[in-house]
Amino acid sequence: MEPPIEPRQDAKELTAHAFSLSSSPELASSIVCGGCGTVIDASEPYPFRCPRSGDDGDHVLRRVLDVSRLAFPLEVSEPNPFVRWRGLFHSYHLATAHGMSDQAYVDLVRDLDSEVARVDGHGFVVTPFTAAPALADPLETRASIWVKDETGNVAGSHKARHMFGLLVHLEVVRLLGMTDGPIPPLAIASCGNAALAAAVVAAAGRRRLLVFVPTDAEAKVLDRLRVLGAEITVCPREAGVAGDPTYHRLQAAIADGALPFTCQGNENGLAIEGGETLGYEMAAALAGQGRLDHVVIQVGGGALASAVAQGLSESAALGVLPGMPRVHTVQTAGAWPLARAFELVAGRLPAKPGPEEVHAAIRYAAAHRSEFMWPWETVPHSLAHGILDDETYDWVAVVEAMLMTGGQPLVVNEGEIAQANGIGVEATGIEVDPTGSAGLAGLAQLCRRGLIGPDEHAAVLFTGARR
Protein backbone atom coordinates (compact mmCIF):
# COMPACT_ATOMS: atom_id res chain seq x y z
CA MET A 1 0.00 0.00 0.00
CA GLU A 2 1.33 3.43 -0.92
CA PRO A 3 1.52 6.02 1.88
CA PRO A 4 -1.07 8.80 1.75
CA ILE A 5 -0.02 12.12 0.27
CA GLU A 6 0.23 14.89 2.84
CA PRO A 7 -1.35 18.31 2.14
CA ARG A 8 0.69 21.11 0.56
CA GLN A 9 0.18 24.59 1.98
CA ASP A 10 -0.44 26.31 -1.36
CA ALA A 11 -3.07 23.74 -2.28
CA LYS A 12 -4.82 24.24 1.06
CA GLU A 13 -4.90 27.97 0.38
CA LEU A 14 -6.46 27.23 -3.03
CA THR A 15 -9.31 25.36 -1.38
CA ALA A 16 -9.80 28.10 1.20
CA HIS A 17 -10.03 30.71 -1.58
CA ALA A 18 -12.25 28.59 -3.79
CA PHE A 19 -14.88 27.81 -1.21
CA SER A 20 -14.36 30.41 1.54
CA LEU A 21 -15.84 28.30 4.32
CA SER A 22 -14.61 27.22 7.74
CA SER A 23 -14.56 23.74 9.27
CA SER A 24 -15.87 22.51 12.59
CA PRO A 25 -13.24 22.16 15.36
CA GLU A 26 -14.93 18.96 16.64
CA LEU A 27 -14.98 16.85 13.50
CA ALA A 28 -12.64 16.84 10.53
CA SER A 29 -15.74 17.59 8.46
CA SER A 30 -18.60 20.01 8.90
CA ILE A 31 -21.75 21.09 7.10
CA VAL A 32 -21.78 24.82 6.37
CA CYS A 33 -24.24 27.04 4.52
CA GLY A 34 -22.57 28.53 1.46
CA GLY A 35 -24.98 31.46 1.56
CA CYS A 36 -25.00 32.67 5.16
CA GLY A 37 -22.15 30.74 6.80
CA THR A 38 -24.33 28.90 9.33
CA VAL A 39 -22.57 25.78 10.65
CA ILE A 40 -24.99 22.91 11.17
CA ASP A 41 -24.74 21.24 14.57
CA ALA A 42 -22.99 17.88 14.35
CA SER A 43 -25.86 16.30 16.30
CA GLU A 44 -28.34 17.06 13.50
CA PRO A 45 -29.21 13.68 11.91
CA TYR A 46 -30.45 15.20 8.65
CA PRO A 47 -28.09 18.09 7.77
CA PHE A 48 -29.74 18.68 4.42
CA ARG A 49 -31.03 22.28 4.43
CA CYS A 50 -29.94 25.47 6.16
CA PRO A 51 -32.36 26.43 8.98
CA ARG A 52 -32.16 30.04 7.79
CA SER A 53 -33.42 29.26 4.29
CA GLY A 54 -36.58 30.97 3.12
CA ASP A 55 -35.30 34.47 2.31
CA ASP A 56 -33.66 35.57 -0.95
CA GLY A 57 -30.37 33.96 0.03
CA ASP A 58 -28.98 30.85 -1.65
CA HIS A 59 -28.77 28.61 1.40
CA VAL A 60 -27.15 25.53 -0.14
CA LEU A 61 -25.20 23.50 2.40
CA ARG A 62 -21.68 22.30 1.66
CA ARG A 63 -19.62 19.60 3.30
CA VAL A 64 -16.28 21.15 4.28
CA LEU A 65 -13.13 19.25 5.24
CA ASP A 66 -10.35 20.34 7.55
CA VAL A 67 -7.59 19.12 5.25
CA SER A 68 -4.92 19.74 7.90
CA ARG A 69 -6.31 16.70 9.75
CA LEU A 70 -6.71 14.41 6.76
CA ALA A 71 -4.71 12.56 4.11
CA PHE A 72 -5.61 11.31 0.64
CA PRO A 73 -5.39 7.49 0.38
CA LEU A 74 -3.69 6.25 -2.76
CA GLU A 75 -4.14 2.50 -2.17
CA VAL A 76 -5.00 0.89 -5.47
CA SER A 77 -6.16 -2.46 -4.10
CA GLU A 78 -9.55 -1.17 -2.89
CA PRO A 79 -12.04 -1.01 -5.78
CA ASN A 80 -14.98 0.52 -3.88
CA PRO A 81 -14.66 4.34 -3.82
CA PHE A 82 -16.89 4.63 -0.74
CA VAL A 83 -14.51 2.40 1.19
CA ARG A 84 -11.30 3.76 -0.31
CA TRP A 85 -12.12 7.42 0.39
CA ARG A 86 -14.21 6.87 3.52
CA GLY A 87 -11.94 9.16 5.54
CA LEU A 88 -13.16 12.12 3.46
CA PHE A 89 -16.85 11.49 4.21
CA HIS A 90 -18.88 13.36 6.79
CA SER A 91 -20.76 10.16 7.61
CA TYR A 92 -17.46 8.49 8.52
CA HIS A 93 -16.38 11.27 10.87
CA LEU A 94 -19.85 11.35 12.42
CA ALA A 95 -19.83 7.58 12.89
CA THR A 96 -16.36 7.32 14.40
CA ALA A 97 -16.94 10.33 16.67
CA HIS A 98 -19.90 8.43 18.15
CA GLY A 99 -17.93 5.25 18.77
CA MET A 100 -18.38 3.28 15.56
CA SER A 101 -15.13 1.55 14.65
CA ASP A 102 -13.46 1.90 11.29
CA GLN A 103 -14.15 -1.77 10.58
CA ALA A 104 -17.82 -1.41 11.51
CA TYR A 105 -18.16 1.50 9.08
CA VAL A 106 -16.42 -0.47 6.32
CA ASP A 107 -18.70 -3.45 6.99
CA LEU A 108 -21.75 -1.17 6.74
CA VAL A 109 -20.63 0.21 3.38
CA ARG A 110 -19.84 -3.26 2.04
CA ASP A 111 -23.19 -4.64 3.21
CA LEU A 112 -25.07 -1.79 1.52
CA ASP A 113 -22.99 -2.22 -1.62
CA SER A 114 -23.86 -5.93 -1.66
CA GLU A 115 -27.52 -4.94 -1.56
CA VAL A 116 -26.96 -2.58 -4.50
CA ALA A 117 -25.40 -5.49 -6.40
CA ARG A 118 -28.42 -7.64 -5.53
CA VAL A 119 -30.75 -5.03 -7.02
CA ASP A 120 -28.72 -3.81 -10.02
CA GLY A 121 -26.33 -6.64 -10.82
CA HIS A 122 -23.15 -5.01 -9.52
CA GLY A 123 -21.98 -2.56 -6.90
CA PHE A 124 -19.70 0.46 -6.91
CA VAL A 125 -16.15 0.34 -8.25
CA VAL A 126 -13.71 2.97 -9.44
CA THR A 127 -14.71 3.70 -13.04
CA PRO A 128 -12.26 4.16 -15.95
CA PHE A 129 -10.51 7.49 -16.45
CA THR A 130 -8.17 7.18 -19.40
CA ALA A 131 -6.66 9.08 -22.29
CA ALA A 132 -8.74 8.93 -25.48
CA PRO A 133 -6.32 9.81 -28.31
CA ALA A 134 -8.92 8.90 -30.95
CA LEU A 135 -10.85 12.05 -29.98
CA ALA A 136 -8.00 14.38 -30.99
CA ASP A 137 -8.50 14.27 -34.78
CA PRO A 138 -12.29 14.79 -34.77
CA LEU A 139 -11.81 17.74 -32.39
CA GLU A 140 -8.92 19.04 -34.51
CA THR A 141 -6.62 19.36 -31.52
CA ARG A 142 -3.24 18.06 -30.43
CA ALA A 143 -4.21 18.28 -26.78
CA SER A 144 -4.46 15.16 -24.63
CA ILE A 145 -8.13 14.32 -24.10
CA TRP A 146 -9.22 12.17 -21.15
CA VAL A 147 -12.61 10.56 -20.60
CA LYS A 148 -14.17 9.55 -17.29
CA ASP A 149 -16.57 6.75 -18.20
CA GLU A 150 -19.58 6.46 -15.89
CA THR A 151 -21.82 4.54 -18.29
CA GLY A 152 -21.04 1.24 -16.56
CA ASN A 153 -21.71 2.55 -13.08
CA VAL A 154 -24.64 1.54 -10.90
CA ALA A 155 -27.93 2.31 -12.72
CA GLY A 156 -25.98 3.43 -15.80
CA SER A 157 -24.87 6.90 -14.70
CA HIS A 158 -23.00 8.91 -12.08
CA LYS A 159 -26.22 9.72 -10.20
CA ALA A 160 -26.10 6.67 -7.96
CA ARG A 161 -22.91 8.00 -6.35
CA HIS A 162 -24.86 10.90 -4.87
CA MET A 163 -27.64 8.61 -3.64
CA PHE A 164 -25.35 5.98 -2.13
CA GLY A 165 -23.48 8.58 -0.10
CA LEU A 166 -26.84 9.69 1.29
CA LEU A 167 -27.91 6.12 2.06
CA VAL A 168 -24.70 5.48 4.00
CA HIS A 169 -25.35 8.63 6.04
CA LEU A 170 -28.96 7.62 6.72
CA GLU A 171 -27.87 4.18 7.87
CA VAL A 172 -25.18 5.66 10.11
CA VAL A 173 -27.62 7.95 11.93
CA ARG A 174 -30.11 5.06 12.25
CA LEU A 175 -27.51 2.74 13.74
CA LEU A 176 -26.29 5.47 16.10
CA GLY A 177 -29.84 6.00 17.36
CA MET A 178 -29.86 9.66 16.35
CA THR A 179 -33.48 9.43 15.16
CA ASP A 180 -36.65 7.91 16.56
CA GLY A 181 -40.07 7.04 15.21
CA PRO A 182 -40.87 5.46 11.85
CA ILE A 183 -38.41 5.73 8.98
CA PRO A 184 -39.62 8.55 6.69
CA PRO A 185 -40.01 7.98 2.94
CA LEU A 186 -37.43 9.26 0.47
CA ALA A 187 -38.41 11.57 -2.40
CA ILE A 188 -36.95 12.75 -5.70
CA ALA A 189 -37.99 14.74 -8.77
CA SER A 190 -36.42 13.35 -11.95
CA CYS A 191 -37.07 12.43 -15.56
CA GLY A 192 -34.56 9.62 -15.92
CA ASN A 193 -31.12 8.73 -14.63
CA ALA A 194 -31.48 10.33 -11.20
CA ALA A 195 -34.79 8.58 -10.58
CA LEU A 196 -33.37 5.23 -11.69
CA ALA A 197 -30.34 5.68 -9.46
CA ALA A 198 -32.48 6.69 -6.50
CA ALA A 199 -34.76 3.71 -7.03
CA VAL A 200 -31.87 1.25 -7.13
CA VAL A 201 -30.23 2.66 -4.02
CA ALA A 202 -33.51 3.03 -2.12
CA ALA A 203 -34.37 -0.59 -2.92
CA ALA A 204 -30.93 -1.62 -1.68
CA GLY A 205 -31.64 0.20 1.57
CA ARG A 206 -35.17 -1.23 1.69
CA ARG A 207 -36.66 2.25 1.90
CA ARG A 208 -39.84 3.67 0.44
CA LEU A 209 -39.24 6.08 -2.48
CA LEU A 210 -41.57 8.70 -3.96
CA VAL A 211 -40.66 9.73 -7.53
CA PHE A 212 -42.13 12.80 -9.24
CA VAL A 213 -41.74 12.67 -13.02
CA PRO A 214 -42.73 14.94 -15.93
CA THR A 215 -45.40 14.01 -18.44
CA ASP A 216 -42.81 13.15 -21.10
CA ALA A 217 -40.90 10.64 -18.98
CA GLU A 218 -39.91 7.62 -21.07
CA ALA A 219 -42.11 4.55 -20.71
CA LYS A 220 -39.13 2.22 -20.26
CA VAL A 221 -37.84 4.38 -17.40
CA LEU A 222 -41.24 4.28 -15.71
CA ASP A 223 -41.41 0.51 -16.16
CA ARG A 224 -38.03 0.06 -14.49
CA LEU A 225 -39.02 2.37 -11.63
CA ARG A 226 -42.12 0.27 -10.98
CA VAL A 227 -40.07 -2.94 -10.98
CA LEU A 228 -37.79 -1.33 -8.38
CA GLY A 229 -40.78 -0.51 -6.18
CA ALA A 230 -40.84 3.27 -6.60
CA GLU A 231 -44.12 5.14 -6.11
CA ILE A 232 -44.55 7.33 -9.22
CA THR A 233 -46.46 10.60 -9.55
CA VAL A 234 -46.71 12.20 -13.02
CA CYS A 235 -46.63 16.00 -12.78
CA PRO A 236 -48.08 18.12 -15.63
CA ARG A 237 -47.16 21.78 -15.93
CA GLU A 238 -49.75 24.21 -14.60
CA ALA A 239 -50.70 27.30 -16.60
CA GLY A 240 -49.19 30.43 -15.10
CA VAL A 241 -46.93 28.54 -12.68
CA ALA A 242 -43.22 29.04 -13.39
CA GLY A 243 -40.64 26.37 -12.74
CA ASP A 244 -40.44 22.60 -12.89
CA PRO A 245 -43.72 20.99 -11.72
CA THR A 246 -41.90 17.89 -10.50
CA TYR A 247 -39.75 20.07 -8.28
CA HIS A 248 -42.84 21.79 -6.84
CA ARG A 249 -44.30 18.38 -5.94
CA LEU A 250 -40.99 17.32 -4.42
CA GLN A 251 -41.01 20.37 -2.17
CA ALA A 252 -44.56 19.57 -1.08
CA ALA A 253 -43.55 15.99 -0.22
CA ILE A 254 -40.59 17.23 1.81
CA ALA A 255 -42.90 19.60 3.68
CA ASP A 256 -45.03 16.55 4.50
CA GLY A 257 -42.05 14.75 6.04
CA ALA A 258 -40.28 12.96 3.21
CA LEU A 259 -36.49 13.13 3.10
CA PRO A 260 -34.95 14.65 -0.05
CA PHE A 261 -33.17 11.83 -1.88
CA THR A 262 -31.98 14.06 -4.68
CA CYS A 263 -28.92 15.36 -6.46
CA GLN A 264 -30.03 18.96 -5.93
CA GLY A 265 -27.86 20.57 -3.30
CA ASN A 266 -30.47 23.16 -2.41
CA GLU A 267 -32.74 20.42 -1.07
CA ASN A 268 -29.98 18.18 0.26
CA GLY A 269 -26.50 19.65 0.49
CA LEU A 270 -25.07 16.32 1.63
CA ALA A 271 -25.95 14.81 -1.78
CA ILE A 272 -22.84 16.44 -3.25
CA GLU A 273 -20.51 14.37 -1.07
CA GLY A 274 -21.07 11.04 -2.81
CA GLY A 275 -20.49 12.66 -6.19
CA GLU A 276 -17.12 13.97 -5.05
CA THR A 277 -15.73 10.47 -5.46
CA LEU A 278 -15.63 11.30 -9.18
CA GLY A 279 -13.09 14.03 -8.47
CA TYR A 280 -11.11 11.79 -6.13
CA GLU A 281 -10.92 9.03 -8.74
CA MET A 282 -9.77 11.45 -11.44
CA ALA A 283 -7.13 12.91 -9.14
CA ALA A 284 -5.88 9.48 -8.08
CA ALA A 285 -5.50 8.41 -11.72
CA LEU A 286 -3.35 11.47 -12.40
CA ALA A 287 -1.36 11.41 -9.14
CA GLY A 288 2.36 11.56 -9.72
CA GLN A 289 2.13 11.03 -13.48
CA GLY A 290 0.01 13.72 -15.03
CA ARG A 291 -1.81 17.00 -14.77
CA LEU A 292 -5.20 18.32 -15.71
CA ASP A 293 -5.58 21.76 -17.30
CA HIS A 294 -9.28 21.75 -18.20
CA VAL A 295 -12.37 19.83 -17.17
CA VAL A 296 -15.60 20.34 -19.12
CA ILE A 297 -18.81 19.32 -17.35
CA GLN A 298 -22.41 19.20 -18.55
CA VAL A 299 -24.82 20.98 -16.22
CA GLY A 300 -28.50 20.59 -15.45
CA GLY A 301 -29.16 21.08 -11.76
CA GLY A 302 -25.45 21.55 -11.14
CA ALA A 303 -24.74 18.74 -8.67
CA LEU A 304 -22.27 16.98 -10.99
CA ALA A 305 -20.20 20.11 -11.63
CA SER A 306 -20.32 21.12 -7.97
CA ALA A 307 -19.22 17.66 -6.85
CA VAL A 308 -16.40 17.29 -9.38
CA ALA A 309 -15.09 20.80 -8.69
CA GLN A 310 -15.09 20.25 -4.95
CA GLY A 311 -13.58 16.77 -5.23
CA LEU A 312 -10.74 18.08 -7.41
CA SER A 313 -10.22 21.07 -5.13
CA GLU A 314 -9.94 18.86 -2.06
CA SER A 315 -7.57 16.56 -3.94
CA ALA A 316 -5.38 19.56 -4.77
CA ALA A 317 -5.52 20.73 -1.16
CA LEU A 318 -4.39 17.26 -0.04
CA GLY A 319 -1.40 17.38 -2.41
CA VAL A 320 -2.57 14.92 -5.07
CA LEU A 321 -2.82 17.50 -7.86
CA PRO A 322 -0.49 20.48 -8.38
CA GLY A 323 -3.51 22.78 -8.71
CA MET A 324 -7.06 23.10 -9.97
CA PRO A 325 -7.90 22.74 -13.65
CA ARG A 326 -10.04 25.34 -15.36
CA VAL A 327 -13.63 24.31 -14.73
CA HIS A 328 -15.90 24.83 -17.77
CA THR A 329 -19.60 24.04 -17.89
CA VAL A 330 -21.96 23.14 -20.73
CA GLN A 331 -25.68 23.83 -21.14
CA THR A 332 -27.95 23.57 -24.15
CA ALA A 333 -29.34 26.46 -26.18
CA GLY A 334 -32.73 25.26 -24.94
CA ALA A 335 -32.03 26.40 -21.37
CA TRP A 336 -28.91 28.04 -19.97
CA PRO A 337 -29.72 29.56 -16.56
CA LEU A 338 -26.19 28.90 -15.28
CA ALA A 339 -24.51 30.81 -18.14
CA ARG A 340 -26.95 33.67 -17.54
CA ALA A 341 -26.12 33.75 -13.83
CA PHE A 342 -22.38 33.59 -14.54
CA GLU A 343 -22.56 36.62 -16.82
CA LEU A 344 -24.54 38.56 -14.22
CA VAL A 345 -22.01 37.78 -11.49
CA ALA A 346 -19.05 38.45 -13.81
CA GLY A 347 -20.63 41.80 -14.67
CA ARG A 348 -19.94 42.91 -11.10
CA LEU A 349 -16.21 42.21 -11.45
CA PRO A 350 -13.30 44.11 -13.00
CA ALA A 351 -11.55 42.69 -16.08
CA LYS A 352 -8.95 40.83 -14.01
CA PRO A 353 -10.49 40.18 -10.60
CA GLY A 354 -8.51 38.92 -7.64
CA PRO A 355 -9.76 36.25 -5.22
CA GLU A 356 -11.21 38.73 -2.75
CA GLU A 357 -13.15 40.50 -5.49
CA VAL A 358 -14.55 37.17 -6.65
CA HIS A 359 -15.48 36.26 -3.08
CA ALA A 360 -17.27 39.58 -2.61
CA ALA A 361 -19.27 39.11 -5.81
CA ILE A 362 -20.16 35.54 -4.83
CA ARG A 363 -21.25 36.63 -1.35
CA TYR A 364 -23.52 39.26 -2.89
CA ALA A 365 -24.96 36.76 -5.37
CA ALA A 366 -25.56 34.18 -2.65
CA ALA A 367 -27.46 36.77 -0.61
CA HIS A 368 -29.54 38.00 -3.58
CA ARG A 369 -30.47 34.82 -5.44
CA SER A 370 -33.40 36.27 -7.37
CA GLU A 371 -31.11 38.75 -9.14
CA PHE A 372 -29.05 35.93 -10.65
CA MET A 373 -31.02 32.68 -10.76
CA TRP A 374 -34.67 32.22 -11.70
CA PRO A 375 -36.65 29.63 -13.69
CA TRP A 376 -36.09 29.54 -17.44
CA GLU A 377 -38.95 31.40 -19.08
CA THR A 378 -39.79 28.90 -21.83
CA VAL A 379 -40.30 25.14 -21.87
CA PRO A 380 -36.90 23.77 -22.97
CA HIS A 381 -36.30 20.92 -25.42
CA SER A 382 -33.08 19.14 -26.38
CA LEU A 383 -31.50 15.84 -27.32
CA ALA A 384 -29.66 16.29 -24.03
CA HIS A 385 -32.93 16.24 -22.12
CA GLY A 386 -31.22 15.23 -18.88
CA ILE A 387 -29.73 18.71 -18.44
CA LEU A 388 -32.86 20.75 -19.13
CA ASP A 389 -33.43 21.89 -15.55
CA ASP A 390 -35.38 25.13 -15.30
CA GLU A 391 -32.86 26.31 -12.71
CA THR A 392 -29.29 25.38 -11.85
CA TYR A 393 -29.83 24.64 -8.19
CA ASP A 394 -26.14 24.40 -7.24
CA TRP A 395 -25.23 27.48 -9.27
CA VAL A 396 -23.29 29.47 -6.65
CA ALA A 397 -20.63 26.81 -6.07
CA VAL A 398 -20.29 26.20 -9.81
CA VAL A 399 -20.05 29.90 -10.74
CA GLU A 400 -17.46 30.33 -8.01
CA ALA A 401 -15.42 27.39 -9.30
CA MET A 402 -15.44 28.81 -12.84
CA LEU A 403 -14.47 32.30 -11.71
CA MET A 404 -11.71 31.05 -9.41
CA THR A 405 -10.17 28.78 -12.05
CA GLY A 406 -10.68 30.89 -15.17
CA GLY A 407 -13.28 28.58 -16.67
CA GLN A 408 -16.21 29.50 -18.88
CA PRO A 409 -19.91 28.65 -19.18
CA LEU A 410 -20.55 27.22 -22.64
CA VAL A 411 -23.86 26.99 -24.51
CA VAL A 412 -24.16 24.42 -27.30
CA ASN A 413 -26.83 23.96 -29.96
CA GLU A 414 -28.56 20.77 -31.03
CA GLY A 415 -26.20 20.21 -33.95
CA GLU A 416 -23.19 20.39 -31.65
CA ILE A 417 -24.80 18.00 -29.17
CA ALA A 418 -25.62 15.43 -31.87
CA GLN A 419 -22.20 15.70 -33.51
CA ALA A 420 -20.36 15.34 -30.21
CA ASN A 421 -22.38 12.28 -29.29
CA GLY A 422 -21.59 10.65 -32.62
CA ILE A 423 -17.89 11.46 -32.28
CA GLY A 424 -17.78 10.24 -28.70
CA VAL A 425 -19.41 6.90 -29.43
CA GLU A 426 -17.36 6.23 -32.57
CA ALA A 427 -13.99 7.33 -31.20
CA THR A 428 -14.21 5.65 -27.80
CA GLY A 429 -16.65 2.79 -28.27
CA ILE A 430 -18.54 3.99 -25.20
CA GLU A 431 -22.33 3.80 -25.60
CA VAL A 432 -23.00 7.20 -24.04
CA ASP A 433 -26.26 9.11 -24.48
CA PRO A 434 -26.47 12.75 -25.73
CA THR A 435 -26.86 14.11 -22.20
CA GLY A 436 -23.85 12.16 -20.98
CA SER A 437 -21.62 13.37 -23.82
CA ALA A 438 -22.73 17.02 -23.79
CA GLY A 439 -19.46 17.99 -22.13
CA LEU A 440 -17.66 16.84 -25.28
CA ALA A 441 -19.72 19.33 -27.30
CA GLY A 442 -18.40 22.04 -25.01
CA LEU A 443 -14.83 20.82 -25.34
CA ALA A 444 -15.18 20.82 -29.13
CA GLN A 445 -16.32 24.43 -28.93
CA LEU A 446 -13.30 25.37 -26.81
CA CYS A 447 -11.01 23.65 -29.33
CA ARG A 448 -12.59 25.54 -32.25
CA ARG A 449 -12.06 28.80 -30.39
CA GLY A 450 -8.39 28.00 -29.83
CA LEU A 451 -8.75 27.91 -26.04
CA ILE A 452 -7.19 24.45 -25.55
CA GLY A 453 -3.43 24.45 -26.05
CA PRO A 454 -1.67 21.66 -27.98
CA ASP A 455 0.30 20.61 -24.91
CA GLU A 456 -2.62 20.77 -22.51
CA HIS A 457 -4.68 18.01 -20.89
CA ALA A 458 -8.48 18.26 -20.92
CA ALA A 459 -11.11 15.94 -19.47
CA VAL A 460 -14.77 15.24 -20.10
CA LEU A 461 -17.15 12.95 -18.25
CA PHE A 462 -19.40 10.49 -20.07
CA THR A 463 -22.09 10.24 -17.46
CA GLY A 464 -25.08 8.36 -18.87
CA ALA A 465 -25.51 5.15 -20.85
CA ARG A 466 -27.72 4.85 -23.92
CA ARG A 467 -30.89 3.01 -22.98
Show the residue positions of the predicted features.
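Positively charged, low-complexity intrinsically disordered leader regions
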Residues: 91-179
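A short, small-residue-rich loop immediately preceding and capping a beta-strand
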Residues: 176-201, 205-214, 291-301, 327, ...
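Active-site-proximal loop->helix
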Residues: 182-185, 194-240, 244-253, 339-343
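Active-site/ligand-binding-proximal alpha/beta "capping" segment
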Residues: 249-318, 419-422
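Catalytic phosphate/nucleotide-handling subdomain of diverse soluble enzymes
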Residues: 440-467
